[in-house]
Amino acid sequence: MTKLLAYFPSPPQGVWHLGPVPIRAYALFIIAGIVAALLIGDRRWEARGGERGVIYDIALWTVPFGLVGGRLYHLATDWRTYWGPGGAGFGAAVRIWDGGLGIWGAVALGAVGAWIGCRRHGIPLPAFADALAPGIILAQAIGRLGNYFNQELYGRETTLPWGLEIFYRRDPSGYIDPHSLDGVSTGQVALVVQPTFLYELLWNLLIFVALLYADRRLTLGHGRLFALYVAGYCVGRFCVELLRDDTATHIAGIRINSFTSTFVFIGAVVYLMAAPKGREDPESLRGNQYVEEEPAEPEPATVAATTEAATEGVAAPADGAEAAGADATAQRPEESAEPDVEKPESEETEAEAAEEPESEETEAAEEPGEPEAEEPEEPEAEEPEEPETEEPEADSDEEPEEESGEAPEQPVAEEPEPAPQQPETKRRWGARLRDRLSGR
């Protein structure tokens, strides 16, 4: 017997008991792989423009469907172990924690669950698959450590230095068997085999790095990155299947997983070549949640009501201004009527009658100067009524003369319409001149 220079030992056991509860390494690594895939997928989904946390919502559909699909594929391809002569029976078929998941069934039925989740959130399934692809292959690599602890899915016997030692294990009932999942190693080597779990683990890690690099350099989208993951994994799985020697279903002397890997590889390559280039629009990855957050357009009735309210608010001050203007206009006739009341009280003499032509000339001369009276009305315009002291007649005579001198420059015909107070101003000047000429 050739003495090995080196060897790769198997773990002494694959299950620990916490009281009556068994803690299985296989289940722990499966859970760890799922968590890693979701964490990576969530970060990648957000980087592509999607909403953070959507991956976890869709995982509520994807993970259960994937576990059921993986178990169904395992039962379909290894049915003799459960229903063949001396099979373990239906009870063992449902004990998924004992190991036995087929990756192709997990991917196929998991895709159905992902489609349901994506449809409910309004996001495209190919984009979701691209974001999750690197995490899936990493989860597969972590899950292979569970096969290592279970001493399962190993290869043929070998004399290579890195060969894997398979120990005999004794279960709680005392039965010794290298395939015992609940047993503890006796320290006795049963055989040395190819560590196929390690080969596939390393290959999966290589695909994980390659996917990240290709996604960054080539900006793959529309499901093309997921297709690249499937094609790459099929190549590695096909090669590993050639080294395995465990119990499996064969077709024409070839393991069934080799057939599956071949056909799935062809389908992945065809999709990779036919899918659209580039990536999806980031806005399409936000789904129904983004649509709900968009502000709703105001209804026409609401817009009309708002416009009417604004119009009424503007019209109200204008109406108030018009009312104030009307009140002011109503007061002006009363003021203009005051001189008419004073006229009967002043008795005109014959001398005043003789001087009336002069006052008429003065009034005519004052008309060209009326633009000064048309300036904005101010309280100062009524000052001529306030002074009680009499000014020298010379001053009063000079003012009309100066104004009469300016008369030819501005014809009366070109003057704008007189202000409402114009007649009142003429009467006041006429009354003052008559009073001063009469010696009052």
Swiss-Prot record:
Keywords: Cell membrane, Membrane, Transferase, Transmembrane, Transmembrane helix. It holds the Pfam family LGT. Pathway: Protein modification; lipoprotein biosynthesis (diacylglyceryl transfer). Its main location: membrane. It is a multi-pass membrane protein. The keyword Transmembrane applies. One of its GO terms (cellular component) is plasma membrane. A 1,2-diacyl-sn-glycero-3-phospho-(1'-sn-glycerol) binds at residue 144. It is an enzyme of class 2 (transferase). Residues 280-440 are annotated as: Disordered. The keyword Thylakoid does not apply. Residues 347-417 have a biased composition (Acidic residues). GO terms for biological process: lipoprotein biosynthetic process. Residues 299-330 have a biased composition (Low complexity). InterPro entries: Lgt. Residues 332-346, 424-440 have a biased composition (Basic and acidic residues). Catalyzes the transfer of the diacylglyceryl group from phosphatidylglycerol to the sulfhydryl group of the N-terminal cysteine of a prolipoprotein, the first step in the formation of mature lipoproteins. Belongs to the Lgt family. This is Phosphatidylglycerol--prolipoprotein diacylglyceryl transferase.
